[in-house]
């Protein structure tokens, strides 16, 4: 035996010797003789490889030279045998071996280098060597050119990114240090590279140290700040990265610093001086960030459709081997850079806090092992021995030496300078003192707790709060404060995770991993543990008896087989998801069920019973005992993961769609599963069971579930008629459980539970688990469950989930939230959701229900409301309310159509206005408009780009979409000046405080501003988490008093914004003012608290933020249905930024203080509302004072709060409201009252800022809102689709998918009809047209309109002449920056001659592809009106106005203005005389009555027919009390109801005008083709606004027609429209959209010769109109009035006797 062992040992020894000989024979041959220490280091780094020394003298850095020789050998082996090779930064020796020698292995070779002084000298030296002299002649010629810096076929000298040699592979031997990733990406694109193998030095210390000398590995480096001048970087372009792409890898704080320095004339960059240890030769200077990027960046995206995957393959000392490959874009790459191997740590330097000179470093980097030894030594010594520091210094000096025992190093030496040793010892002594103090405090607190009355754990929690990392917990001593704990501690260096996609600064520490619990799969090991008493197996529960099936229903299975197409449609509908993995899973499932033939399934088994009864556990135990392979199918991923923890191989668990492919594969391989278990089976359709049987016919199918829990839900709406599993229960062999082990006793004992499971018992040890808590109750240890997605979103901060998502899961404690909404009431009535909600817990159930509905449902008690002040008997009825009945009625359906984009655009232009000469995508002015303040712009850089940009669109002249592009500097500058040079109108301080007090009182009536500690802690935690997730670091946070923190970067949004009318005037874009991270971080937590209060703190106000439009519509509808006799006001703001003044600032500051915001943070917010500077890179800057910024963290919240405060204060009777930014929706019962006097700014808001719509259907954030339904606005969708331009086919396809998602439900006949009629009602056009437009949108969502069929248009083309005429050549050449001062009378110098007479060049005539521009320069005055802008087609007042030729002469303009004033005065005088004559013929009482009636009629408060001029459709109208004045003498000014009645004095108007008169009187009717009324009168009755705005709720008085009056009015109509002889009587039945009380009347287009009528006809028509307005409601009572009427009729043309019909 011993001899055999000896032989074996001899064989192994011989093999080792042979292997060592092979290694020695193939050793790396060095051309120099390395020192012994360097050779040993190389052997250790590359073990087991060997090195052979040469005969040349050693270099000054032998270890680094050895790395270089190894890299050359590896790269040359990689390049051999390849046809083409590209080498980056080649040496002549390397090129000779690969290509220059006579027998070189590479036929086609190219070297890319960037010629410099160092490389040039080395090439000259190599050219004189013997090895190069032996090369081929053509190679020697190319080498000579390279030595002189001249490019050749073999070598280029401009860098790897500037060459186009084609090769798939490349090599780089320590030559990538100054090649940025951008340049390398260009090289991959230009050369066609797919892989580059490279070597480079990467010292680990570069990650955390600036100065290193590593004698062991033979290198040293020093990080410096290298100064650079502005001329080196050409900063006038405004972007450093344009010339220095290596700066891409600096963080934001460094970037801001560099840009500030660059603006002053110089900046610095971080550079690294690298050389060998003890090397006197030339050192290398590399860019720090470029070098470090190769270590930290793993996946670098490029603009060429691919990314660079950078992988570190090997690391030997400082040398690393890289493999850089071309990879598909978008994948996330992770890598770990270990720093723990060095055993280093940072400790705070106490000398730093005491030194005033600034020479000390903040921390000391030293050995973690030595620090631990010092700390352990201090803890074992009494305090008095450590006071004089002598003992500590002696112990520390003893640790400097290495300890070697038996040639083995048991303790390494400590390389530390004497100065650092002193500082380390002193710093550790201070840390030791603090730690001892903490221990004393902890012990004292524990003693007090043990012998006191307080809880030990509660006290210890507060004492150790900050030490354990818990937030917002303060100890009883200063040593436990967060400041002390963070500052005075040892920071161990952790590993760095490289998760870099765009910036390598996004690095973090590895999270701590909790080791998983041990799982035993070995039965023998289990037996051993069981015998040893270490493992106790739970007893197998008893199995209930089997109930045999009751018959077999063949028809049911036939219907199941027929539902297979519906199931396929459900899977296909799910393919619209953006989750890549889910999409792949669904595609595989579709492939699996292709070609299946379903047959009836016999022999089904079912395990059913109450929740927690052990159904699944019993089945698992039975199957394991029987053996065999089972597949467990779960409906959700969470249930599948829970199942994985319970089963053992070879059984497996899968989700429902993945399981299908597993079954087919197992059957095809001949190893099918013996049993298939479908858990929570009632959540599946029955066709799934048939599919499982078809895929695995031999498998036994067992169903597990509870018929009383939540069943199958058709989320896609494609399988409404499919049979369910509950239909097949009686055909299964059933095992019914009736004892639960999880549910507590009080849950099982409820009437509700016993009604579902009669006689059910429980074995749970929990007796009392149910608690009814307050609505604001929070518990971080409990899982919050909600009934609807709405409530889940409201309580997202609690980690809430829906009851449906929680089915099948178990929690220790549960908070069941219920708010009493309509949707929740419906789910509660279905019982299944309530059952799941009350059976998910094992210990505690906290019911958060302020309505008491859940308690009544659990005890089966009826809900009753007792009115104590009404003496009437209590009656309970089950009849549904009338609103519910009306909502379920079916309206008239419109047959489906096959619309085309051309037809939809035709209808949109017909109904919403057409600008026939609008042949552009974006409209802008070339002149700049300044409203005040100081602005500085860069004229050269602001010159617009005249290069046409092709896009695709559905129409040549885009009508309704405003396009802004952030890359267009002209638009960006125009936006900056137009939006941020305006000023807000501040109130006196005492008036502003009064307004704030009133607005706070209004907000308090709707919101509870109480903030709990949990909510505050959660907001702070989420703010910090979000800040770090976005790459924020402590270095990014500047002090609030930093002067650079006030500089705000301005950016313009790239967007396409829809408008309901054609855009034919200059438009500016929307800007983003990007505040610093410091400012946003200070207030971010408190803003989160305010947003949470807005979402959840009110039951009468909805904060519409964060939900899709479909969900928002359902939530609004549920709230509106609770308001009886709902009436609406929809409001939007104009110039919302300027509406914010000091009142808005004081209001928001007051709310911040109310929720507990620190005073310093509130003061910082107030300061940020003051003066600041907005800077647009390369364009200019604007000084802003008081104006609102759109990029601050508080802006969205502040906008909503301010809008809500104003609207809730000015309007009375609000029962429900919804707000989102400047959009408002108010809902009242019967009426809403407006009172502008409640705020000092009320009148200004009414006349200038507020746009209000008062009607039965109002718009709100893309929705149409009525008392019955809330639906999406299909017209706005159509305007967006057919009015926008599309830049690429990819973006077009994404837009199609988005439209498909929102139009899923539009195919439903009832909803389609609803959309048609509501859209037709609101926009006043035929429902057939609405149906056509809706069907066109649906077809777009289906993808019926390919991208290739769209027209090619030119987006935003500026006319060259406009710029040249605006900015003369001498001005543009001499004046680079022009400063705009506040508005002055005189123009700035240099612009007077040009700007005095702005000319419109001939090239500005509107044509396809060219935008409308006006040529003027902002000199502090408003721009001139453009004379060539065509008016809107439906604008009646503009059509009646004669076209006035443009002139630049101010005298002509003044003369025309004087003529206009004289004409208006004469008109007023004649009108007054005529009114006095009419009034003198009436009795005084009748005079007052008729005057009052006429005023009310014209203001729209009394009902009746009134003639209005048709105008272009507008979605809203303003609060303005003045009529809109035309630019010339028109009839519209006299006949429009918006004009102020001449008979009304100021006193009478103030006495008779109701609350809504200011904006009711400014509305004009629309031109409609044919008014339409749906057949359901019960639902759509009383559509026009009621006169109940004043509080009157009665019916309208009936108005009689007068034949003579009808004849006069018909004369007026005939005079205005000769082709129209009568008004259709059907118009009186129309369902017309009105604003205020103006009626809609149908009119065709006006005649072209109407403007040519003489003055007599105009006077007669005007007089007839006045008489008609006086007589429509009141018959002529006197003969004098009749005589006047006859006199008027005699002066007009003959009029046929035709009756006039009134609108509804």
UniProtKB/Swiss-Prot annotation:
Chain segments annotated as coiled-coil in the UniProt record: none
Gene Ontology cellular component terms for the protein in this record: host cell cytoplasm
Domain (+)RNA virus helicase C-terminal: 738-880
Catalytic activity: RNA(n) + a ribonucleoside 5'-triphosphate = RNA(n+1) + diphosphate; ATP + H2O = ADP + phosphate + H(+)
Listed Low complexity bias regions: 1505-1518
Alphabetical keyword list: ATP-binding, Helicase, Host cytoplasm, Hydrolase, Nucleotide-binding, Nucleotidyltransferase, RNA-directed RNA polymerase, Transferase
Superkingdom per UniProt: Viruses
Residues in (+)RNA virus helicase ATP-binding domain copies: 575-737
Polar residues composition bias: residue spans: 1635-1644
EC number assigned by the record: 2.1.1.-, 2.7.7.48, 3.6.4.13
Limits of the Alphavirus-like MT domain: 52-295
Composition bias type Basic and acidic residues, residue spans: 1475-1501
Gene Ontology biological process terms in this record: DNA-templated transcription; mRNA modification; RNA processing
A GO molecular-function descriptor: ATP binding
Cellular location(s): Host cytoplasm
Stretch list, region Disordered: 1475-1518, 1621-1649, 1678-1704
Main localization, broad class: host cell
Family: Belongs to the ssRNA positive-strand viruses RNA-directed RNA polymerase family.
Function per UniProt: RNA-dependent RNA polymerase replicates the viral genome composed of 2 RNA segments, RNA1 and RNA2.
Name by which UniProt lists this protein: Methyltransferase/helicase/RNA-directed RNA polymerase
């Amino acid at each position: 035996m011993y001899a055999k062992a000896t032989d074996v040992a001899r064989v192994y020894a011989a093999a080792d010797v042979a292997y060592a000989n092979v290694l020695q024979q193939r050793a790396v041959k060095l051309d120099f003789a390395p020192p012994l220490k360097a050779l040993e280091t190389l052997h250790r780094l590359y073990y087991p490889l060997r090195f052979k020394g040469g005969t040349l003298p050693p270099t000054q850095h032998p270890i680094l030279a050895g790395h270089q020789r190894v890299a050359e050998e590896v790269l040359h082996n990689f390049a051999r045998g390849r046809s083409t090779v590209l080498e980056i930064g080649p040496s002549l020796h390397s090129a000779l071996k690969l290509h220059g020698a006579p027998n070189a292995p590479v036929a086609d070779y190219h070297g890319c280098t960037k010629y410099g002084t160092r490389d040039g000298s080395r090439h000259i030296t190599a050219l004189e060597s013997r090895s190069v002299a032996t090369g081929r002649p053509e190679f020697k010629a190319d080498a000579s050119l390279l030595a002189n810096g001249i490019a050749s076929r073999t070598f280029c000298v401009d860098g790897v990114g500037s060459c186009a040699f084609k090769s798939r592979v490349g090599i780089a031997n320590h030559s990538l240090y100054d090649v940025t990733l951008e340049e390398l990406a260009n090289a991959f694109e230009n050369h066609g590279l797919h892989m580059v193998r490279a070597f480079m030095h990467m010292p680990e210390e570069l990650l955390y140290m600036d100065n290193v000398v590593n004698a062991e590995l033979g290198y040293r480096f020093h990080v410096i700040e290298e100064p650079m001048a502005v001329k080196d970087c050409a900063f006038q372009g405004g972007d450093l990265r344009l010339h220095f792409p290596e700066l891409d890898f600096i963080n934001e704080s460094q970037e801001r610093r560099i840009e500030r320095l660059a603006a002053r004339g110089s900046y610095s960059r971080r550079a690294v001086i690298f050389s060998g240890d003890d090397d006197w030769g030339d050192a290398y200077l590399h860019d720090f960030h470029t070098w470090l990027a190769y270590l930290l960046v793993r996946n670098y995206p490029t603009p060429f459709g691919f990314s660079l995957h950078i992988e570190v393959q090997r690391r030997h000392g400082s040398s690393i081997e890289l493999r850089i490959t071309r990879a598909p874009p978008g994948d996330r790459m992770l890598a770990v850079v270990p720093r723990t191997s060095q055993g280093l740590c940072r400790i705070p330097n106490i000398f730093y806090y005491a030194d005033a000179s600034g020479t000390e470093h903040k921390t000391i980097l030293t050995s973690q092992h030595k620090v631990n030894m010092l700390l352990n030594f201090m803890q074992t010594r009494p305090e008095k021995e450590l006071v004089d520091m002598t003992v500590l210094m002696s112990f520390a000096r003893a640790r400097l030496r290495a300890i070697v025992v038996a040639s083995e190093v048991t303790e390494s030496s400590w390389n530390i300078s004497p100065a650092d040793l002193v500082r380390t010892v002193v710093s550790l002594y201070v840390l030791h003192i603090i730690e001892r103090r903490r221990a004393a405090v902890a012990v004292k607190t524990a003693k007090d707790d043990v012998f006191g009355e307080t809880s030990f754990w509660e006290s210890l929690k507060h004492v150790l709060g900050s030490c354990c990392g818990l937030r917002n917990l303060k100890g009883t001593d200063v040593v436990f404060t967060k400041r002390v704990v963070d500052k005075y501690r040892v920071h161990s260096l952790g590993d760095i995770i490289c998760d870099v996609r765009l910036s390598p600064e996004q690095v973090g520490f590895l999270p701590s991993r909790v080791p998983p619990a041990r799982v035993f799969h070995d039965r023998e090991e289990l037996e051993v543990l069981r015998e040893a008493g270490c493992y106790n197996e739970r007893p197998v529960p008893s199995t209930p008896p089997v109930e045999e099936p009751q018959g077999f229903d063949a028809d049911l299975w036939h219907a199941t087989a027929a539902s297979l197409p519906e199931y396929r449609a459900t899977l296909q509908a799910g393919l619209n998801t953006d989750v890549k993995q889910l999409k792949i899973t669904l595609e595989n499932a579709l492939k699996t069920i292709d070609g299946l033939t379903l047959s009836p399934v016999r022999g089904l088994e079912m395990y059913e019973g109450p929740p927690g009864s052990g159904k699944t556990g019993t089945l698992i135990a039975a199957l394991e005992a029987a053996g065999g392979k089972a597949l467990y199918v779960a409906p959700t991923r969470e249930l599948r993961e829970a199942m994985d923890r319970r089963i053992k191989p070879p059984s497996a668990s899968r989700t429902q769609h993945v399981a299908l492919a597993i079954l087919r594969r197992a059957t095809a391989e001949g190893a099918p599963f013996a049993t298939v278990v479908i858990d929570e089976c009632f959540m599946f359709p029955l066709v799934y069971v048939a599919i499982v049987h078809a895929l695995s016919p031999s498998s036994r199918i067992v169903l597990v579930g509870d018929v009383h829990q939540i069943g199958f839900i058709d989320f896609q709406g494609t399988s409404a008629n499919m049979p369910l599993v509950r239909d097949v229960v009686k055909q299964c062999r059933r095992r019914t459980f009736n004892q639960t082990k999880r549910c507590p006793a009080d849950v099982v004992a409820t009437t509700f539970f016993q009604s579902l499971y009669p006689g059910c018992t429980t074995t749970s040890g929990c007796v009392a688990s149910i608690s009814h808590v307050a609505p604001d109750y929070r518990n971080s240890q409990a899982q919050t469950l909600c009934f609807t997605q709405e409530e889940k979103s409201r309580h997202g901060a609690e980690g809430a989930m829906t009851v449906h998502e929680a089915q099948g899961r178990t929690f220790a404690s549960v908070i069941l939230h219920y708010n009493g909404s309509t949707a929740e009431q419906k789910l509660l009535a279905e019982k299944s959701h309530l059952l799941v909600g009350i059976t998910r817990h094992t210990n505690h159930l906290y019911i958060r229900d302020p309505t008491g509905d859940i308690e009544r449902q659990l005890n089966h008690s009826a809900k009753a409301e007792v009115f104590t002040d009404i003496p009437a008997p209590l009656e309970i009825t089950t009849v549904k309310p009338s609103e519910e009945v009306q909502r379920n009625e079916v309206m008239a359906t419109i047959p489906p159509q096959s619309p085309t984009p051309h037809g939809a655009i035709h209808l949109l232009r017909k109904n919403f206005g057409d600008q026939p000469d609008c042949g552009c995508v974006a409209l802008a002015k070339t002149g700049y408009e300044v409203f005040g303040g100081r602005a500085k712009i860069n004229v050269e850089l602001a010159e617009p780009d005249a290069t046409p940009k092709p896009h695709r669109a559905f129409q040549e002249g885009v009508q309704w979409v405003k396009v802004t592009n952030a890359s267009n500097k002209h638009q960006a500058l125009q936006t900056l000046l137009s939006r941020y040079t305006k000023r807000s109108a501040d109130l006196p301080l005492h008036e502003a405080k009064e307004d704030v007090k009133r607005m706070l009182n209004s907000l308090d009536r709707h919101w509870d501003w109480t903030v709990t500690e949990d909510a505050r802690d959660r907001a702070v935690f989420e703010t910090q988490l979000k800040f770090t997730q976005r790459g924020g670091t402590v270095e990014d946070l500047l002090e609030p008093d930093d002067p650079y923190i006030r500089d705000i970067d301005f950016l313009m949004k790239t967007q396409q914004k829809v408008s309901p009318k054609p855009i034919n005037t200059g438009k500016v874009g929307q800007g983003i003012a990007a505040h610093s991270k410091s400012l946003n971080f200070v207030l971010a937590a408190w803003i989160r608290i305010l947003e949470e209060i807005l979402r959840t703190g009110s039951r009468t106000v909805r904060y519409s933020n964060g939900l899709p439009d479909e969900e928002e519509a359902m939530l609004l509808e549920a709230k509106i249905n609770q308001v009886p006799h709902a009436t609406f006001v929809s409001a939007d703001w104009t110039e919302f930024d300027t509406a914010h003044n000091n009142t808005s600032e004081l209001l928001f500051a007051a709310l911040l203080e109310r929720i507990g915001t620190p005073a310093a943070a509130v003061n910082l917010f107030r300061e940020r509302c003051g003066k600041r500077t907005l800077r647009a890179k390369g364009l200019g800057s604007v000084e802003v004072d008081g104006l609102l910024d759109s990029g601050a963290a508080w802006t969205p919240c502040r906008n909503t709060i301010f809008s809500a405060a104003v609207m809730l204060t000015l309007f009375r009777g609000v029962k429900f409201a919804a707000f989102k930014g400047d959009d408002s929706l108010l809902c009242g019962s019967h009426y809403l009252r407006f009172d502008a006097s409640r705020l000092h700014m009320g009148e200004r808001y009414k006349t200038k800022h507020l746009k209000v719509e008062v009607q039965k259907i109002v718009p709100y954030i893309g929705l149409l809102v009525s008392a019955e339904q809330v639906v999406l606005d299909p017209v706005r969708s159509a305007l967006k689709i057919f009015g926008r331009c599309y830049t690429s086919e990819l973006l077009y396809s994404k837009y199609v998918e988005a439209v498909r998602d929102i139009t899923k439900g539009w195919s439903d006949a009832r909803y389609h009809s609803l959309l048609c009629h509501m859209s037709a009602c609101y926009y006043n056009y035929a429902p057939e047209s609405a149906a056509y437009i809706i069907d066109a949108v649906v077809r777009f969502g289906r993808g019926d309109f390919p991208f290739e069929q769209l027209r090619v248009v030119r987006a935003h083309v500026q006319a060259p002449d406009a710029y040249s005429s605006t900015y003369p050549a001498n001005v543009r050449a001499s004046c680079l920056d022009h400063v705009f001062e506040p508005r002055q009378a005189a123009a700035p110098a240099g612009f007077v001659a040009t700007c005095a007479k702005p000319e419109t060049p001939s090239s500005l005539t509107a044509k396809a592809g060219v935008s409308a521009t006006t040529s003027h320069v902002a000199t502090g005055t408003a721009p001139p009106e453009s004379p060539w802008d065509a008016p809107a087609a439906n604008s009646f007042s503009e059509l009646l106005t004669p076209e006035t030729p443009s002139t630049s002469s101010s005298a002509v303009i003044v003369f025309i203005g004087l003529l206009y004033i004289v004409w208006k005065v004469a008109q007023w005088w004649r009108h007054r005389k005529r009114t006095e004559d009419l009034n003198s013929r009436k009795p005084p009482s009748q005079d007052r009555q008729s005057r009052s009636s006429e005023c009310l009629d014209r203001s729209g408060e009394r009902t009746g027919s009134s003639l209005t001029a048709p105008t272009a459709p507008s979605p809203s109208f303003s609060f303005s009390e003045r009529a809109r004045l035309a630019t010339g003498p028109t009839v519209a000014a006299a006949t429009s109801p918006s004009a102020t009645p001449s008979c009304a004095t100021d006193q009478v108007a103030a006495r008779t005008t109701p609350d809504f008169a200011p904006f009711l009187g400014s509305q004009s009717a629309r031109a409609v083709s044919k008014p339409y009324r749906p057949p359901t009168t019960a639902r759509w009755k009383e559509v026009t606004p009621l006169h109940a705005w004043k509080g009157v709720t009665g019916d309208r008085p009936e108005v009689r027609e007068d034949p003579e009056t009808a004849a006069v009015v018909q004369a007026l109509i005939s005079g205005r429209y000769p082709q129209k002889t009568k008004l259709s009587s059907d118009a009186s039945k129309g369902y017309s959209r009105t604003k205020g009380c103006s009626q809609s009347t149908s009119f065709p287009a006006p005649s072209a010769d109407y403007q040519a009528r003489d003055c007599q006809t105009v006077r007669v028509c005007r007089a007839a109109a006045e008489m008609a307005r006086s007589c429509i409601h009141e018959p002529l009572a006197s003969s004098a009035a009749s005589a006047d009427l006859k006199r008027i009729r005699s002066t007009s043309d003959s009029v046929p006797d035709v009756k006039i019909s009134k609108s509804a």
